[in-house]
């Protein structure tokens, strides 16, 4: 991997943490991921995949809704 070993990678990680701060790293990673996804989508390299947020396309009915329909 470009001739980088563990000590060099740890040094790069330490510099990134010092520059951006540990609290901003998740936001930077999320922004980078969204940018890569939109770039792939623009070139047709990736289809839209469902997210794990729990917002499924099929709505579920609660038991109280089912009970009122039977009565």
From Swiss-Prot:
The chain crosses the membrane at residues 9-29. Residues 52-71 have a biased composition (Polar residues). It is a single-pass membrane protein. Residues 43-71 are annotated as: Disordered. InterPro entries: TatA/B/E (IPR003369), TatA/E (IPR006312). One of its GO terms (cellular component) is TAT protein transport complex. One of its GO terms (biological process) is protein transport by the Tat complex. It comes from the Bacteria. One of its GO terms (molecular function) is protein transmembrane transporter activity. It is found in: Cell inner membrane. Keywords: Cell inner membrane, Cell membrane, Membrane, Protein transport, Translocation, Transmembrane, Transmembrane helix, Transport. The keyword Metal-binding does not apply. Part of the twin-arginine translocation (Tat) system that transports large folded proteins containing a characteristic twin-arginine motif in their signal peptide across membranes. TatA could form the protein-conducting channel of the Tat system. Belongs to the TatA/E family. The Tat system comprises two distinct complexes: a TatABC complex, containing multiple copies of TatA, TatB and TatC subunits, and a separate TatA complex, containing only TatA subunits. Substrates initially bind to the TatABC complex, which probably triggers association of the separate TatA complex to form the active translocon. This is Sec-independent protein translocase protein TatA. The gene is tatA.
């Amino acid at each position: 991997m470009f001739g980088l070993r563990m000590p060099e990678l740890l040094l790069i990680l330490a510099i990134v943490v010092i520059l951006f701060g540990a609290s901003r790293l998740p936001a930077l990673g999320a922004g980078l991921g969204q940018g890569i996804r939109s770039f792939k989508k623009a070139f047709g390299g990736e289809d839209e995949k469902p997210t794990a947020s729990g917002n499924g396309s099929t709505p579920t009915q609660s038991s109280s809704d089912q009970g009122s329909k039977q009565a």
